[in-house]
Every structure is written in structure tokens, then in C-alpha cells.
Amino acid sequence: MKKSIFFLAASAIMFAMGSCTNDVLDNVQQVDSSLPQTRATASNDWTYAYVLSEGTWHVAPPSSPGNIVRYDNNWTKKSTLEIGDTGNDLIQYGSKLYCAVSGHDLTADNGGIWVLNAKTGQLLTPQMKQYDDEKTGHKAMPRHLAAANGKVYISFYSGAVMSIDTMNYAKVNYLELDATYSEGICIGKDNKVYVCNSGNTDDTQAGEGTTISVLPLTLD
């Protein structure tokens, strides 16, 4: 299970990410008791924290859905939003939060994007926004997010990238990559889009890839 945490302050945003897997937890043999067993923030001068929980992915039994939990600065839970199968990324851009939900697999048609008001945590999209992935002929399986120039860029697990408008969340541009299992995405200081591909074109399993796609912001 993976969790991402946002701390919202009046003047700044701090982002922390942690992750764990059942494999890691199952193989823990002992705990060093000399190390602190709790984690604390340096101060409580932030307003809200948003915690993205990936959920649990299973072939069988069915996966447990992911969620976004909103806490106040006393770590009192204020709200929980169930987001679906495999919440994978959460970013803030401007006054909004964007959450990528991958869905179960490339043909499950249950992945998409949620948009929330960063200040209130209220949904700005009454339903998860879903996008067609021309490479698979199915609904897209979003993995990670980046933002620049009024657009949010989304990497698709099929090996494609899409940009959407931050006003109406409509598709702006789409590009199929010569790769599969695209994962991390960022915007460089050179105003280019960088995408890490964990599979190459003919790979049948994620993790076999060694390529990074470098693209213009126009994705052409």
C-alpha cells in the first residue's frame, strides 16, 4: 500500500511521500528499538493534510478501494473520499488537487482523474473523469501527474501521455510513446516533459524498460 501526504499551510505547501508493500512488511524480522517508532512534523503551522491511500491491488479477492483522507493540524480526520481501484498519484496545481487512479488493469476501464478543491477538499468533478486511450482502445490507466502552463500531464500505463486543460479537464493533446508501462512524469526547467518507462516497446512485464521519453509541452 502506498500513501502520499500533503500538508497545506497558509503560505507554503510541503509534500512528503512514503510507501510500503506487503512484501516488505511480511519480511520484517525485527525492529531496532533504539529508533523512534513515530514520525512527527517539525511544527503544526499547516492547515490540512491530505493522505492518498493506494488501496490493495488483488487479482482475487477483489481489490480494496483507495481513498483520500483529509486531516486537520491536530490529525483529526475530517473527511474520506473513496476514489476507486489503485489511487496512484496526488498533486496540487494552483487551487486544485488532481488524483490519478490507475484502475485494475489496462482493459478494466475503471481508471481516471479526480479533481478537488485544495482548500476545502470538496470534489470539483462529480464523477471521476475518464479518458480514452487510443493505444489500447480502452479507458486510460493513469499512473503519474505533472503540471505546467495551465495543463496537467498524465502518464498512461499503456505507454502514452495526455495533457488536459485545468479549467474544463478536457483532453488537449495525446501522444503514444515507443514504450510501455510509463510511470513517473515531470516538467523540466527546459520546459520539456520527461517520462520514465518501466517497459520498452516489446517488453511483456513492467520493470524491464530502460528508457526516458523527452517531449515538448505540446506533445507533438
Language model features with spans:
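Solenoidal tandem-repeat scaffolds enriched in leucines and small polar residues
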Residues: 171-220
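Short coil/turn segments that connect the beta-strands within blades of beta-propeller domains
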Residues: 45-47, 94-95, 149-150, 190-191
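Residue position within the beta-strands of beta-propeller blades
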Residues: 51, 99-100, 154, 195
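A short beta-strand motif characteristic of beta-propeller blades
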Residues: 75-82, 122-136, 170-176, 220
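Repeated scaffold domains used in trafficking and secretory/extracellular systems
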Residues: 35-41, 85-94, 135-146, 179-188
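Short glycine/acidic-enriched loop and turn motifs that connect beta-strands
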Residues: 55-60, 103-108, 159-160, 199-204
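A short loop-to-beta-strand structural motif that recurs across blades of beta-propeller domains
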Residues: 66-69, 111-114, 160-163, 210-213
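Bacterial Sec-dependent N-terminal signal peptides
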Residues: 4-5, 16-49
